[in-house]
Design a protein with these regions (language model features):
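Short connector loops at secondary-structure junctions
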Residues: 73-89
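Hydrophobic beta-strand segments of well-ordered beta-sheets in folded domains
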Residues: 114-119
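Short catalytic helix/loop segments, enriched in acidic residues and glycine
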Residues: 60-68
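Active-site and ligand/interface coordination hotspots across diverse enzymes
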Residues: 1-57
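Charged, often glycine-rich, active-site loop that binds/positions anionic groups
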Residues: 84-105
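Residue-level detector of conserved catalytic or cofactor/ligand-binding positions
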Residues: 120-129
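Short, charged beta->alpha transition segments
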Residues: 29-35, 103-110
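Charged helix-capping and loop-helix junction motifs
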Residues: 58-61, 101-103
Length: 129
């Protein structure tokens, strides 16, 4: 994997300490959210909700508990599609290719810049109506 073209995973100060958060401000999409460490538990979900540094949703509170209980020094959340939505009906019907490409770049960056353990979290999602 060539890392010279990948974005730099950079920690910043947010409520509660140092976080990885891409983009660095609340947007209608999110690529990366997690705690800083060298050996993270990396979880891949379907799409992000409203969570942000210092304000985790129930899913990310569970990821954080699981990482802590299993002696990981950190955790990072990714999603198959980066668009934020609390309701599947609000998601893009046709994926935005630019969002998908940037999402993959951030996943590659984390894999190249940390020593992760991957965890794929699957749930049943109905087709939006």
């Amino acid at each position: 994997m060539h890392t010279d073209a990948l974005p730099l995973l950079k920690a910043d100060e947010y409520p509660g300490g140092l976080w990885y958060y891409e983009p660095h401000t609340y947007q209608p999409y999110r690529y990366v959210l997690g705690r800083v460490g060298r050996h993270p538990l990396v979880c891949i979900g379907i799409n992000p909700s409203t969570a942000q540094p210092g304000a985790l949703d129930p899913t990310l509170k569970s990821v954080e508990r699981l990482a802590n209980a299993n002696d990981f020094d950190s955790w990072i959340m990714f999603n198959v599609y980066p668009q934020r939505a609390t309701d599947p009906n609000d998601m893009d019907r046709v994926p935005d290719r630019a969002l998908c490409d940037e999402n993959l770049r951030w996943l590659q960056a984390v894999l190249a810049q940390t020593e992760p353990t991957m965890w794929l979290s699957l749930i049943h999602i109905s087709e939006p109506t």
